[in-house]
Amino acid sequence: MKNILDYTLEELTLWMKENNESSFRAKQIMSWIYKDVRNFSDMRNMPKSLIAKLEENFEISLPEIEEIYKSELDGTEKFLFKFSDGNLIESVLMRYKHGNSICISTQIGCRMGCKFCASTIDGRIRNLTTGEILSQILVVQNYIGERISNVVLMGSGEPLDNYENVMKFLEVVSAEYGLNIGQRHITLSTCGIVPKIYELADKELSITLAISLHAFSDEKRKEIMPIANKYSIDEILNACKYFINKTKRRITFEYSLVKDVNDSKEDARALGKLLKGMLCHVNLIPVNEIKERTFKRSSKETIQDFANILSNLGIEVTVRREMGSDINAACGQLRRSYIKTQETRGE
């Protein structure tokens, strides 16, 4: 049984033609699905014969909410979802004055091996399908009864390592027939898979591209990010410049500050020199400490000094506001702790 959420409008239209149904039915079905109708029999303008075909060939498959954790500090909510195969993923809902933002996962686990990230510790289990990525938004919207207006692909997984499914997701989530979330309200974060950055640039989407940089030199980057052994910083920056040229969109560089690893004033000056002249913005992130790693976060004073140096060098910079710190809202942390708890209980 296929999950109809995995289909784009074009793909569903083709299915209609192949099954001797009117093409316009595809758009009607999409309209029902993205209005939260979860049974084909409730699609009132569908002929019974088509409903029977849909029920025979498709399902509308959504994950179950396994756990919800709500921050007492800022209202951030972390959702732990379970799919039909038993695998778990997590999403984070962040509420702002300008609207609701959700951080979603694109893979179960991750194989990139970044040393400061909990989601990569057990490697990649599998990719999420297009529908499984979309379903995180659908379930949360239904739960809170409010619209999600901003999406960040910064949860578990490397989006460009699940390229085809993520590209289909970007189409549906921003399409009028889908969730109709403007591309300028979508951010995709990558550790820097260079060939895929070029492919993404050629699509000329209006999304924001965020690069997990975390170091100014290849030598230092290799210590914390294995991907640096395959793609150099120069290669990544060249791909970023190509992306900027094709899309006219500013790049965000993410920089997790780790005490005594990449947070010195020399690091800040070198980073500023590296990025000077680029249409970019640096987002400084106090590293999330996890049990399996020895990394410690930099002090507030060190972080502010780092930001000031970049700003004085003409680099646009912000320090990421921490959300949900009391509920381990960083990617991968909830899933791992939940699995360990279940193992301890023998479940």
Curated annotation (Swiss-Prot):
Signal peptide: none annotated. Keywords: 4Fe-4S, Cytoplasm, Disulfide bond, Iron, Iron-sulfur, Metal-binding, Methyltransferase, rRNA processing, S-adenosyl-L-methionine, Transferase, tRNA processing. InterPro entries: Aldolase_TIM, Methyltransferase_A, RlmN_N, RNA_MTrfase_RlmN, rRNA_lsu_MTrfase_RlmN/Cfr, rSAM. Pfam families: Radical_SAM (PF04055), RlmN_N (PF21016). GO terms for biological process: rRNA base methylation; tRNA methylation. Binds 1 [4Fe-4S] cluster. The cluster is coordinated with 3 cysteines and an exchangeable S-adenosyl-L-methionine. Its cofactor is [4Fe-4S] cluster. Gene3D superfamilies: 1.10.150.530, Aldolase class I. GO terms for molecular function: 4 iron, 4 sulfur cluster binding; metal ion binding; rRNA (adenine(2503)-C2-)-methyltransferase activity; rRNA binding; tRNA (adenine(37)-C2)-methyltransferase activity; tRNA binding. S-adenosyl-L-methionine binds at G157, E158, S189, S212, L213, H214, N288. The active site is at E90, C331. [4Fe-4S] cluster binds at C110, C114, C117. It is an enzyme of class 2 (transferase). Its EC number is 2.1.1.192. Specifically methylates position 2 of adenine 2503 in 23S rRNA and position 2 of adenine 37 in tRNAs. Belongs to the radical SAM superfamily. RlmN family. This is Probable dual-specificity RNA methyltransferase RlmN. It comes from Clostridium botulinum (strain Alaska E43 / Type E3). The gene is rlmN.
